[in-house]
Design a protein with these regions (language model features):
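A structural signal for conserved, well-ordered secondary-structure elements
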Residues: 1-322
């Protein structure tokens, strides 16, 4: 297979710029997490969620006043739309179900609403702690499984750089949540785990092509590992972008047309899909190329042919490929 482009895009030649952009985004994410902190849903910290539906012309100020008079002055209120009807999503730290129901009923009465206009969900702190523990275990097991799979299928260096790209993606997504103060819910955690799969897929596709081209290239064809990696990215980048764009269409529809629950999932997925595609060629592949070039075999080839860049990498390595 030849590159999709008449002239290859020099991704590896711009690796320092790409890695610097990623480093800046990661630093901004860490700053956001430290400075603003993360807002967790009641599923993680325990508390109450009151979903007011079909509230008509009631304003957010009126809702806050009603909640304050009912004993929920510290509750957070956000507007929500379900099936075209206006509503509100209220979150508070109340963990006693009886108290939560009493407060919800009092607020509804003050606003002229009935029991049919709201639902109350209360989660105790123990359940929230279990959710945190389960989510942490899920992420740890996923990372270890990725390292094991990529190491066995390809090599250890590829597994570490693939995980580095995943950490890059997840850190930036969490940073966005810190800066925007959007609550992290179990749906967000599910989205993060899904993003790990998409990001890993993009990276493995590139790694697989690098392996194939590396077997055909090398000293005999005067091909450095940097050149092999760059050509491999150019071979698969169009397919990767097309796959991402195709996936973004239903996710975007889910974000704008779905309810609050679907929007939580879709928001993380929108960010993660873009980051996963970016990190595959801007983080994982450059890091692998830099690491592999230090190996004696590839270091020797780099020293001999590293300055030879006039001939497109694909002219020889791709001959006879589909």
């Amino acid at each position: 297979m030849r590159s999709h482009f008449a002239h290859e895009i020099n991704f590896i030649g711009h690796r320092r710029v790409l890695l610097t952009v990623s480093a800046v985004l990661c630093v901004l994410s860490v700053v956001g997490i430290i400075a603003r902190g993360l807002v967790f849903g009641i599923e993680f910290r325990g508390g109450t969620e009151i979903d007011f539906q079909s509230t008509g012309d009631i304003t957010i100020a009126q809702m806050r006043d009603a909640l304050a008079s009912a004993g929920e002055a510290e509750a957070t209120v956000q507007t929500a739309t379900s099936e075209g009807e206006a509503g509100f999503l209220v979150r508070s730290d109340t963990t006693d179900p009886n108290t939560a129901n009493a407060h919800a009923a009092a607020a509804a009465e003050a606003l002229g609403l009935t029991k049919a206009n709201y639902t109350v969900t209360t989660i105790g702190p123990d359940w929230g702690a279990d959710t945190v523990r389960s989510s942490s275990i899920a992420f740890l097991v996923s990372i270890l499984a990725i390292i094991a799979f990529v190491s066995l299928r390809y090599e250890f260096k590829m597994s570490i750089t693939a995980v580095a790209a995943l950490v890059h993606d997840l850190l930036i997504i969490v940073g966005v949540y810190a800066w925007t103060q959007v609550p992290i819910t179990p749906n967000v955690v599910a989205a993060l785990l899904t993003i790990m799969g998409f990001s890993l897929y993009d990276t493995v596709v590139e790694f697989n092509r690098m392996n194939e081209n590396a077997r055909r290239g090398g000293d005999a064809d005067h091909r450095t590992y940097y050149q092999i990696v760059n050509f491999s990215i150019n071979e698969v980048i169009v397919r990767t972008i097309n796959t991402t764009l195709t996936t973004l269409v239903p996710i975007t529809a889910m974000y704008f047309l779905g309810g609050t629950t679907l929007r939580d999932f879709a928001f993380a997925m929108l960010i993660g899909e873009v980051l996963g595609t970016y990190s595959s060629f801007a983080v994982a592949s450059p890091l692998l190329a830099m690491w592999k070039t230090r190996e004696p075999k590839w270091a020797k080839i780099e020293k001999k042919y590293g300055a030879t860049t006039a001939t497109p990498v694909g002219d020889k390595t791709a001959d006879g490929a589909e």
